[in-house]
Structures are given as structure tokens and as C-alpha cells.
Amino acid sequence: NATLIGSLLDAGLTPVFCAITHDGNGSLLNCNADSIASAVAKGLARLADTDLIFCFEQPGVMRDINDPASVIASITRESYGALRAEGVVTDGMIPKIENALEAVDSGVRSVTIRRSEGILIPGGTRISH
């Protein structure tokens, strides 16, 4: 409900979303937090310019996981396919980038994958068309 979320933001409130959901039958489910953030951003993008930042423990998507200086500055859908084929993007980074691409395709102005430290300083990996 993007309108409700927008109303909360307009009132100066910061909604917090949890990746734990339920199936309606009493069982708890651990959902992908990036999927939830992407869904919220896609909804908000219908109301206003929206930027999404996925924060995790690395400085961005790295060509070499052991070299923090190997951050890939920008990934497009085309380059993502090549990075997967090369084995650079694997495991948990796959759904993170796919959620980012879906968000951009749905009108989110920008998506960045990065560390939370220094979040106001440009950096990380920008996902674009």
C-alpha cells in the first residue's frame, strides 16, 4: 500500500519493514529483505522520485571478492548477464541484483549496492538500464 507508506512519510514517520512474514496459517516465513525493500521502492516510485540503497558488508559488487578495490561501478542488465556467465556474480548476489534490476525497470530512479558506512559519500555499485 504505497499510498499509506507515502502518508506516513509525509507525516514525518519512518516505517520499518521486517523480513519475517507469515503464511496466514501460523507459520513464520523468512523473506528476502532485498525483495521487500524492492517492492516498497517500486510502490513508492509511483508516487515520487525514489532511490533504493541495498546495504551489506561489502563496498559494492566486486569483481574479486577478496579485493575491496575491485568494486564494479555500474551494472546494467546486459553486463549482469556477462558477469553471471563469468562467475563473478554468484550465490546471494544474484537475487540482490535481480531485485535491483526489477526496481529500476519499475521506475525506481536509482539503485545502489554498498556498505552503510559513508552512505552519503558516492560509492558502491549503481544498477541501471
Where is each model-derived feature located?
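C-terminal catalytic "cap/lid" subdomain
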Residues: 1-129
